[in-house]
């Protein structure tokens, strides 16, 4: 009995109604997992040395290493090379049949030194951390399509571990704490905390076109940018002399200059350094049956003193600074068609929770 007329299979569509997608159908995709796939894991090593000197200094040295054993890697089973551009970069296509597999690349290494000392009623602390972290995929999405497609790369699936999006290479923190009695025998405490750290890494990429060079199934804007060597770069066609002048002025005045004539690596650049200074003042008041604690928090004192300070300026994980022609990103000779430059693409002030503005908070609590 045909499926369409079988009353026990009423939910099935007759085979004659099925439609087999064509090879280029954007929805005819499949996803799979490598049968040998292993859950992400890493080898971790840590060593620390604590010292207390005769002068009362408490010093700590610490080293941490997190070496990838197995990490996540995505590939398109239909990935293929369509052509090669003048600079040697490949242009690729794909089917969107994403396969989840493993890579052994990636690591995180961190050094930390800290010191603590009491000077009577004053307590002082300072610590510095230097970190280097590398990975392949940012994994900022729960879907394979976006995890695969929203990863900055230079040549298709030929990817090596580069600096992580979320790495803070340098971080310095220092605190000062002073306790005295200004009202009878009740403690009055002043606490200052200062933090200074380097900005997170970001990539300079191309902009202005829809399909990525790395895979036509992916969105544009994630291809690491080729940096022209000059107005007469043989791998580039500028839309005009004015465009060439603007692009090269930007290149020569920034860190892009060290990559002239080549492709800027993923996360080769850092957002600006940022600093913060916070103050807390607490006053204890003894009630005989308990204690009232009044507190005043002043966060981002730097911004309070100067409106141009204490502001966190960051680039998103990619800055699409080199703009290609929307319809023809490269010509018949494989040369990039550059039509403009956007030096500040992706640069924004991070103030989601008030980090870039000062705040006052006054409150109290009662302890029985």
Regions found by a protein language model. Give the residues of each.
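Gram-negative outer-membrane beta-barrel transporters
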Residues: 60-203
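Outer-membrane beta-barrel "beta-signal"
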Residues: 352-368
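Short sequence motifs at beta-strands and strand-loop junctions characteristic
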Residues: 27-29, 35-41, 102-107, 116, ...
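Outer-membrane beta-barrel and related beta-rich outer-membrane complex signature
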Residues: 1, 27-28, 60, 69-80, ...
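Hydrophobic, lipid-facing positions within transmembrane beta-strands of outer-membrane proteins
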Residues: 33, 43-47, 107-113, 170-176, ...
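Extracytoplasmic gating/loop element in the C-terminal half of outer-membrane beta-barrel translocons
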Residues: 189-288, 319-348
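Transmembrane beta-barrel domains of outer membrane proteins
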Residues: 50, 114-118, 177-179, 282-284, ...
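Solvent-exposed loop/turn elements at secondary-structure boundaries
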Residues: 1-99, 235, 256, 261, ...
């Amino acid at each position: 009995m045909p499926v369409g007329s079988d009353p026990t299979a009423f939910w099935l569509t007759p085979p004659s109604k099925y439609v087999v997608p064509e090879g280029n159908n954007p929805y005819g995709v499949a996803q799979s997992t490598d049968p040998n796939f292993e859950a992400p894991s890493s080898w971790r090593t840590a060593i620390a040395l604590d010292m207390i000197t005769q002068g009362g200094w408490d010093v700590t040295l610490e080293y941490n290493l997190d070496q990838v054993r197995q990490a996540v890697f995505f590939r398109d089973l239909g990935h293929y090379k369509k052509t090669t551009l003048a600079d040697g970069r490949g242009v690729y296509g794909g089917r969107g049949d994403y396969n989840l597999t493993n890579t052994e690349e990636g690591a995180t290494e961190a050094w930390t030194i800290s010191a603590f000392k009491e000077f009577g009623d004053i307590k002082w602390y300072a610590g510095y951390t230097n970190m280097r972290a590398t990975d392949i995929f940012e994994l900022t999405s729960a879907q394979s399509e976006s995890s695969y497609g929203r990863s900055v790369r230079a040549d298709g699936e030929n990817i090596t571990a580069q600096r992580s999006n979320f790495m803070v290479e340098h971080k310095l923190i220092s605190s000062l704490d002073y306790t005295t009695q200004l009202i009878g025998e009740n403690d009055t405490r002043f606490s200052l905390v200062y933090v200074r750290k380097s900005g997170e890494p970001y990539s300079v990429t191309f902009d202005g076109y829809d399909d990525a060079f790395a895979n036509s199934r992916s969105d544009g804007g994630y291809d690491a940018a080729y940096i022209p060597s000059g107005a007469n770069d043989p791998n580039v066609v500028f839309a005009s002399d004015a465009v060439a002048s603007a692009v090269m002025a930007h290149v020569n005045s920034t860190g892009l200059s060290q990559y002239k004539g080549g492709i800027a690596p993923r996360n080769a650049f850092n957002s600006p350094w940022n600093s913060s200074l916070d103050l807390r003042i607490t006053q204890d008041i003894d009630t005989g049956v308990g204690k009232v604690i009044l507190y005043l928090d002043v966060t981002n004192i730097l911004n309070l003193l100067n409106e141009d300070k204490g502001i966190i300026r960051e680039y998103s994980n990619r800055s699409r600074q080199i703009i290609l022609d929307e319809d023809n990103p490269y010509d018949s000779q494989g040369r990039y068609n550059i039509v403009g430059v956007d030096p500040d693409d992706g640069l924004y002030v991070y103030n989601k929770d008030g980090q870039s503005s000062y705040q006052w908070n006054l409150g109290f609590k009662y302890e029985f």
